[in-house]
Each structure stands twice: as structure tokens, then as C-alpha cells.
Amino acid sequence: NVIKELKERFDRIDEIAEYNQLKVLSAMQKNKVAEMHLYGTSGYGYNDEGRDTLERIYADIFKTEDALVRPQIICGTHALNVAISSNLRPGDELLSPVGKPYDTMDEIIGIRPSKGSLAEYNISYRQVDLLPDGSFDYEGIRKAINEKTKLVTIQRSKGYAQRPTLSVERIGELIKFIKDIKPEVICMVDNCYGEFVEKIEPSEVGADMVVGSLIKNPGGGLAPCGGYIAGRKDCIEQAAYRLSSPGLGKEVGATINVNKDFYQGLFLAPTVVAGALKGAIFAANVYEKAGFRCIPDAKEERYDIIQAVELGTKEGLVAFCKGIQAAAPVDSFVTPEPWAMPGYDSDVIMAAGAFVQGSSIELSADGPVKEPYAVYFQGGLTWYHAKFGIMMSMQKMYEKGLLKIN
């Protein structure tokens, strides 16, 4: 019954996926992708045509001047660190106008003291929280922008917060407001979990840089590692010098044997993201009917692939994650347990029986072991797998007496 009710929404998701599929295809054809581009290089990686062509494809998809798409970028957090730290200098200030960013950013910024943080380089940080209703505190943002404000970081996805994920349209409104006050400020969007969810990306509404991970949406489940930064030419140049070395920049960086997976994963990404979106909507609909608070709720529009469900107890959180793990194609026999994961301020439990370690476009669930014991569910390389994962999570909760089935 739930799936029948969702038919109209699923049709709309398919329409967006088709649009984005053709957008990716068009960029690949425009840049004349050939078989030779699928092979990698070794050593320094000079004249890596596959790498350079893929970066032009990303720039076309995101409608930017340039892009950096590299296996040497380890994860989303690393991509953000490269983008931010390369475009700031001592005495500059970083501003987050959408509240506190994801936990792993704390140590980059120096919110939690850490070796090599921006704070150690005399780069200050200011933050303006969202208003209680989830809207932007425009007055607070106006006051926070000063002569030192050099870069603004806007996290699209909610992360581990209970705030709404931002639509591309809302991000555009925020960027316009900021640029009207200080046109030269660099606006960067953490695009993790948001790629291909809408027909447009934040770089099409004024973002100077969009940043993400290839083991999330744009890798399509095939990229074994990597990250991307797409944006203004000068910003990307700075990022490339930080990732490699001053004087080297984008010219070096061997792709070994990942090019084929990067290309093929990108080609599949719009349909993979569509399946993950359907899974998230299905999760909200079944868990809401079972009496749990879901963010976003069953009816709300989606701007990323993450579904948060407030389970209320540690037992519920653990049971949910055990169900997701049991539904995995890899390591389905393993039992996830909470642990002190680097970069987080509380124990975290993670379930991911994935082909790529830590891949969150594959069926996965995680959450910090603290009030309100919310689990964050995302991914599923196919909609059918996402659906099965959700049903397994309900089964495990039912077995523990934490879920009533009407």
C-alpha cells in the first residue's frame, strides 16, 4: 500500500533522473570520451588525458569554469579541507551562516583543538545559527560579515543536525544575500549527499565552489575512492596547489586504474541517486506510520538522500543498524557495535556492508550514540535493495519489542 501511495513521487524522481542522465551523457559526448580515457597513468601522472577530460566533464555538469576530480582526495572531509584551507590565508575569517557544520569539520576549523587546524594558522571562524523554524537569520548574517570574511561555507545536507536540508533554490537566495553585502566573498557549498537530487546544482545559483565525495552520489557506487571540487578557475587553482604542491597543481596526480570506475560511476549516478531517494522516502513513510519522528517527514520535498529517524533509545539505534547490516551483500554476517570513531565527539554506530569501505551511496546507516538517538539512513545501489534494508531494520526492531506492527 505504501508503495502505491508513493507512485506519483517516484515518477517525479524518475523524471529528474532522466534529465540528469542526459546531462551527464551530453557532457561526456561533448568532451569526446574515448576508450583511451578509461586507462590510468602511473608515477607523476603527466598528460593523464582520462583525468583531465573527466575534470572538464565535471565542470560542464556543474556549469563551472574548472574542476578538480582526484583519487588522491580521500573523502568529503578531505575535499572540504583542501577547498577551504587553500583559499584562506592567516588573518582571514571563515563564516558558516547555516549553523554548526558536520562533526568532522570541528577539527579542520579548530572548534575542537586539533593539530593543523585553521585556528593554528590564525584563521578565525564565525557561525550564525538558523532560526528555530529552520530559516536563515539574515540579520545575524549581515552583522557577522566583516572586513575579514573571506570564505562562506554552506552545508547543503543536514548532517547529524535536526535542521532541514537546503534546496538549491534556498542556497541561491542565501548566496545572493551574502554577495549583495560583500561581492568578493567566496561562497562554497558542501554538496555531499545532494548531487543529482535536483535538476540544478548550487554552482548554478552563485556558488563559487561545490565540493563532494566520489564514494557518495557522483561516484555511482563504482568509484573506489576520491573527491571533487568544481568551481571558479582561481579557486580550483588554489585547491590544486594545496592538494599537490605549489608549482605542480593540476599537472600531476596519477589515476592508476580508477578512471574507468570514475567515468562509469558518474554515468550511473543519476539512476543510483534516484533509487536511494526512493529508499529514503519509503523509510520515512513506513517509520512515520510506526510512530517515529522522521526528518524530513513522509511528505516533505527531498534535497538530499539522507533520512533521519528519531528512535529514542540506544537499543533502537543499534537494532536498526543491525538490520541494515544484515541486509548487506558484503559482511551481512557481521554485527555493528558503537565505537569511538575519529572526528566525532561521541560514540558512533555504523552499518555498511558495502563493496567500497565507508561508501554512503551504498545501503548504509549510522548515528551518534546520544539523544535523541537518531539514525541517519542513506543509499542503496538499487531501490529494491534500499527497500529490503528498511524492512530488515524494522524486523530487527520488532524482534527487540521496539516496534509495534499494526
Which residues make up each language-model segment?
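Structural motif
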Residues: D66-V69, D92-L95, K150-L151, E184-C187, ...
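Conserved C-terminal alpha-helix-loop-beta "cap" of PLP-dependent enzymes
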Residues: E288-I405
